[in-house]
Protein backbone atom coordinates (compact mmCIF):
# COMPACT_ATOMS: atom_id res chain seq x y z
CA UNK A 1 0.00 0.00 0.00
CA UNK A 2 1.25 3.46 -0.93
CA UNK A 3 -0.04 6.06 1.55
CA UNK A 4 1.11 9.07 3.52
CA UNK A 5 2.06 12.70 3.14
CA UNK A 6 5.23 12.11 1.12
CA UNK A 7 3.29 10.27 -1.60
CA UNK A 8 1.62 13.55 -2.71
CA UNK A 9 -1.59 11.61 -3.29
CA UNK A 10 -4.90 13.36 -2.58
CA UNK A 11 -8.26 12.00 -1.49
CA UNK A 12 -9.13 10.55 -4.88
CA UNK A 13 -7.50 9.15 -8.00
CA UNK A 14 -9.72 7.67 -10.69
CA UNK A 15 -7.11 5.71 -12.64
CA UNK A 16 -3.87 3.83 -12.26
CA UNK A 17 -1.44 2.31 -14.75
CA UNK A 18 1.35 -0.20 -14.23
CA UNK A 19 4.34 -0.06 -16.54
CA UNK A 20 5.51 -3.66 -16.58
CA UNK A 21 8.44 -2.89 -18.86
CA UNK A 22 9.96 -0.33 -16.49
CA UNK A 23 8.36 -1.52 -13.24
CA UNK A 24 6.65 1.77 -12.45
CA UNK A 25 3.21 2.80 -11.17
CA UNK A 26 1.56 5.89 -12.68
CA UNK A 27 -1.32 7.72 -11.00
CA UNK A 28 -3.15 10.94 -11.92
CA UNK A 29 -3.86 13.42 -9.14
CA UNK A 30 -6.66 15.65 -10.46
CA UNK A 31 -6.87 17.84 -7.36
CA UNK A 32 -3.17 18.72 -7.68
CA UNK A 33 -3.28 18.74 -11.50
CA UNK A 34 -0.39 16.30 -11.59
CA UNK A 35 0.74 12.87 -12.72
CA UNK A 36 2.72 10.93 -10.12
CA UNK A 37 5.12 8.06 -10.85
CA UNK A 38 6.29 5.53 -8.25
CA UNK A 39 8.68 2.61 -8.26
CA UNK A 40 6.92 -0.68 -8.78
CA UNK A 41 7.97 -1.88 -5.33
CA UNK A 42 6.98 1.36 -3.56
CA UNK A 43 5.25 0.86 -0.23
CA UNK A 44 4.16 3.04 2.65
CA UNK A 45 4.92 6.75 2.72
CA UNK A 46 6.98 6.67 -0.48
CA UNK A 47 7.65 9.83 -2.46
CA UNK A 48 7.11 9.69 -6.24
CA UNK A 49 10.25 9.29 -8.33
CA UNK A 50 8.79 11.72 -10.87
CA UNK A 51 5.92 14.20 -10.92
CA UNK A 52 4.56 16.10 -13.91
CA UNK A 53 3.06 19.28 -12.48
CA UNK A 54 3.02 23.01 -13.12
CA UNK A 55 1.63 25.65 -15.49
CA UNK A 56 3.72 24.58 -18.49
CA UNK A 57 2.21 21.08 -18.38
CA UNK A 58 -1.30 22.44 -19.15
CA UNK A 59 -2.71 19.62 -16.99
CA UNK A 60 -6.18 20.16 -15.52
CA UNK A 61 -9.18 17.93 -14.85
CA UNK A 62 -6.88 14.95 -15.39
CA UNK A 63 -8.90 12.01 -14.11
CA UNK A 64 -7.29 9.41 -16.38
CA UNK A 65 -4.11 8.53 -18.24
CA UNK A 66 -2.81 5.99 -20.74
CA UNK A 67 0.71 4.62 -21.10
CA UNK A 68 2.41 3.85 -24.41
CA UNK A 69 5.61 2.06 -23.44
CA UNK A 70 6.32 1.13 -27.06
CA UNK A 71 6.93 4.77 -27.97
CA UNK A 72 7.75 5.85 -24.39
CA UNK A 73 4.85 8.28 -24.15
CA UNK A 74 2.29 9.18 -21.51
CA UNK A 75 -1.12 10.41 -22.68
CA UNK A 76 -3.30 12.59 -20.46
CA UNK A 77 -6.85 13.72 -21.39
CA UNK A 78 -8.05 17.06 -20.04
CA UNK A 79 -11.25 19.05 -20.33
CA UNK A 80 -10.67 20.12 -23.95
CA UNK A 81 -7.44 18.49 -25.12
CA UNK A 82 -5.18 15.44 -25.11
CA UNK A 83 -1.65 16.02 -23.79
CA UNK A 84 1.20 13.73 -24.83
CA UNK A 85 4.33 13.70 -22.66
CA UNK A 86 7.56 11.76 -22.71
CA UNK A 87 7.23 8.78 -20.37
CA UNK A 88 10.20 10.09 -18.39
CA UNK A 89 8.92 13.69 -18.16
CA UNK A 90 9.42 15.29 -14.76
CA UNK A 91 8.51 18.64 -13.26
CA UNK A 92 6.92 21.64 -14.93
CA UNK A 93 7.48 20.50 -18.50
CA UNK A 94 5.47 21.21 -21.65
CA UNK A 95 3.81 18.34 -23.56
CA UNK A 96 5.51 16.87 -26.61
CA UNK A 97 2.25 17.20 -28.53
CA UNK A 98 -1.21 18.59 -27.92
CA UNK A 99 -4.41 17.48 -29.64
CA UNK A 100 -6.85 20.30 -29.08
CA UNK A 101 -9.04 22.89 -30.76
CA UNK A 102 -12.57 23.18 -32.19
CA UNK A 103 -11.98 20.61 -34.95
CA UNK A 104 -11.13 17.90 -32.40
CA UNK A 105 -14.66 18.10 -30.86
CA UNK A 106 -13.09 17.28 -27.47
CA UNK A 107 -15.19 18.38 -24.50
CA UNK A 108 -14.74 16.99 -21.00
CA UNK A 109 -12.82 13.90 -22.07
CA UNK A 110 -13.51 10.89 -19.86
CA UNK A 111 -11.66 7.63 -20.29
CA UNK A 112 -8.73 7.03 -22.61
CA UNK A 113 -6.87 4.18 -24.30
CA UNK A 114 -3.90 4.00 -26.64
CA UNK A 115 -3.06 1.23 -29.11
CA UNK A 116 0.65 1.64 -29.98
CA UNK A 117 0.46 -1.20 -32.51
CA UNK A 118 -2.32 0.24 -34.68
CA UNK A 119 -1.44 3.81 -33.68
CA UNK A 120 -4.76 5.10 -32.36
CA UNK A 121 -5.88 7.05 -29.30
CA UNK A 122 -9.50 6.71 -28.17
CA UNK A 123 -11.25 8.94 -25.64
CA UNK A 124 -14.73 9.27 -24.24
CA UNK A 125 -16.42 12.59 -24.95
CA UNK A 126 -19.20 14.44 -23.13
CA UNK A 127 -20.56 16.64 -25.93
CA UNK A 128 -21.32 15.13 -28.31
CA UNK A 129 -21.57 12.05 -26.09
CA UNK A 130 -19.57 9.24 -27.62
CA UNK A 131 -16.10 8.04 -28.51
CA UNK A 132 -13.50 10.02 -30.45
CA UNK A 133 -10.68 8.14 -32.19
CA UNK A 134 -7.51 9.95 -33.26
CA UNK A 135 -4.28 8.89 -34.91
CA UNK A 136 -1.64 8.41 -32.24
CA UNK A 137 0.69 10.94 -33.87
CA UNK A 138 -1.96 13.63 -34.38
CA UNK A 139 -1.05 17.12 -33.24
CA UNK A 140 -2.88 20.43 -33.02
CA UNK A 141 -6.43 21.21 -34.08
CA UNK A 142 -7.23 18.06 -36.06
CA UNK A 143 -10.55 16.32 -36.60
CA UNK A 144 -10.87 12.79 -35.19
CA UNK A 145 -10.41 9.99 -37.72
CA UNK A 146 -13.76 8.65 -36.52
CA UNK A 147 -16.47 9.56 -34.03
CA UNK A 148 -18.90 7.01 -32.57
CA UNK A 149 -21.98 8.92 -31.42
CA UNK A 150 -25.76 8.79 -31.75
CA UNK A 151 -28.80 6.98 -30.30
CA UNK A 152 -27.84 3.55 -31.68
CA UNK A 153 -24.56 3.61 -29.73
CA UNK A 154 -26.44 3.71 -26.41
CA UNK A 155 -23.74 6.01 -25.04
CA UNK A 156 -24.67 8.51 -22.35
CA UNK A 157 -21.22 8.75 -20.80
CA UNK A 158 -18.15 6.54 -21.19
CA UNK A 159 -15.90 5.85 -18.24
CA UNK A 160 -13.25 3.24 -19.05
CA UNK A 161 -11.52 1.77 -22.08
CA UNK A 162 -9.46 -1.23 -23.13
CA UNK A 163 -8.11 -2.08 -26.57
CA UNK A 164 -7.70 -5.36 -28.44
CA UNK A 165 -4.93 -4.60 -30.98
CA UNK A 166 -5.01 -7.95 -32.79
CA UNK A 167 -8.74 -7.57 -33.50
CA UNK A 168 -8.72 -3.76 -33.82
CA UNK A 169 -11.50 -3.54 -31.26
CA UNK A 170 -12.30 -1.08 -28.52
CA UNK A 171 -13.99 -1.99 -25.24
CA UNK A 172 -15.83 0.83 -23.44
CA UNK A 173 -17.76 0.97 -20.18
CA UNK A 174 -20.91 3.06 -20.59
CA UNK A 175 -22.82 4.52 -17.66
CA UNK A 176 -26.54 5.17 -18.17
CA UNK A 177 -28.16 8.45 -17.19
CA UNK A 178 -29.00 8.83 -13.50
CA UNK A 179 -27.98 5.35 -12.33
CA UNK A 180 -25.84 6.63 -9.47
CA UNK A 181 -29.09 7.97 -7.98
CA UNK A 182 -31.59 5.32 -9.14
CA UNK A 183 -29.22 2.37 -8.54
CA UNK A 184 -30.95 0.57 -11.42
CA UNK A 185 -29.17 -2.62 -12.45
CA UNK A 186 -28.78 -3.48 -16.13
CA UNK A 187 -29.11 -0.06 -17.75
CA UNK A 188 -25.37 0.57 -18.03
CA UNK A 189 -23.25 -1.73 -20.15
CA UNK A 190 -19.87 -2.65 -21.58
CA UNK A 191 -19.75 -2.32 -25.36
CA UNK A 192 -17.36 -3.45 -28.08
CA UNK A 193 -16.76 -1.44 -31.24
CA UNK A 194 -14.39 -1.74 -34.20
CA UNK A 195 -11.72 0.91 -34.66
CA UNK A 196 -13.23 1.53 -38.10
CA UNK A 197 -16.73 2.29 -36.76
CA UNK A 198 -17.89 5.82 -37.44
CA UNK A 199 -21.15 7.63 -36.75
CA UNK A 200 -24.27 6.19 -35.14
CA UNK A 201 -23.11 2.58 -34.79
CA UNK A 202 -24.45 0.10 -32.24
CA UNK A 203 -21.85 -1.99 -30.38
CA UNK A 204 -21.03 -5.29 -32.09
CA UNK A 205 -21.28 -7.01 -28.70
CA UNK A 206 -22.31 -5.92 -25.21
CA UNK A 207 -22.39 -7.01 -21.59
CA UNK A 208 -25.80 -5.72 -20.56
CA UNK A 209 -28.82 -6.72 -18.50
CA UNK A 210 -29.84 -7.37 -14.92
CA UNK A 211 -27.80 -10.55 -14.63
CA UNK A 212 -24.58 -8.58 -15.24
CA UNK A 213 -25.12 -6.74 -11.90
CA UNK A 214 -23.69 -3.58 -13.49
CA UNK A 215 -24.86 -0.18 -12.26
CA UNK A 216 -21.99 2.28 -12.79
CA UNK A 217 -19.11 0.51 -14.56
CA UNK A 218 -15.74 2.24 -14.56
CA UNK A 219 -12.43 0.66 -15.55
CA UNK A 220 -12.14 -2.31 -17.90
CA UNK A 221 -9.26 -4.67 -18.62
CA UNK A 222 -8.83 -7.78 -20.75
CA UNK A 223 -7.02 -10.98 -19.78
CA UNK A 224 -6.13 -12.54 -23.13
CA UNK A 225 -4.62 -15.66 -21.58
CA UNK A 226 -7.81 -16.67 -19.77
CA UNK A 227 -10.24 -14.93 -22.18
CA UNK A 228 -11.79 -12.85 -19.42
CA UNK A 229 -12.80 -9.21 -19.12
CA UNK A 230 -12.60 -7.39 -15.79
CA UNK A 231 -14.90 -4.47 -14.91
CA UNK A 232 -14.97 -2.27 -11.81
CA UNK A 233 -18.33 -0.88 -10.68
CA UNK A 234 -18.42 2.34 -8.63
CA UNK A 235 -21.87 1.91 -7.07
CA UNK A 236 -21.61 -1.82 -6.44
CA UNK A 237 -18.10 -1.28 -5.06
CA UNK A 238 -17.23 -4.53 -6.80
CA UNK A 239 -14.90 -6.16 -9.30
CA UNK A 240 -16.69 -8.30 -11.90
CA UNK A 241 -15.25 -10.92 -14.26
CA UNK A 242 -17.00 -11.93 -17.50
CA UNK A 243 -16.25 -14.40 -20.27
CA UNK A 244 -14.64 -12.55 -23.19
CA UNK A 245 -15.13 -15.56 -25.47
CA UNK A 246 -18.88 -15.76 -24.75
CA UNK A 247 -19.22 -12.03 -25.26
CA UNK A 248 -17.73 -12.23 -28.74
CA UNK A 249 -19.98 -15.19 -29.54
CA UNK A 250 -22.98 -13.06 -28.60
CA UNK A 251 -23.96 -15.31 -25.68
CA UNK A 252 -23.42 -12.72 -22.94
CA UNK A 253 -25.85 -9.82 -23.12
Regions found by a protein language model. Give the residues of each.
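Blade-level signature of beta-propeller repeat domains, shared across WD40, Kelch, NHL, RCC1
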Residues: 219-253
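Residue position within the beta-strands of beta-propeller blades
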Residues: 27, 76, 123, 172-173, ...
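Beta-rich, blade/repeat-based domains predominating
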Residues: 5-21, 55-73, 102-118, 151-168, ...
Amino acid sequence: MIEGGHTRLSRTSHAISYDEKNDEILVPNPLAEAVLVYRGDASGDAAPIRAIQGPHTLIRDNDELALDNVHDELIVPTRESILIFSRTANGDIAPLRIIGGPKTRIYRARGIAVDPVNNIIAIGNSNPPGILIFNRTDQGDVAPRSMITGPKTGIYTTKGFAVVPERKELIATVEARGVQVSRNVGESFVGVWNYSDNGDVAPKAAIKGETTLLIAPRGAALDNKHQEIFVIDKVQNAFFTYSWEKLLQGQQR
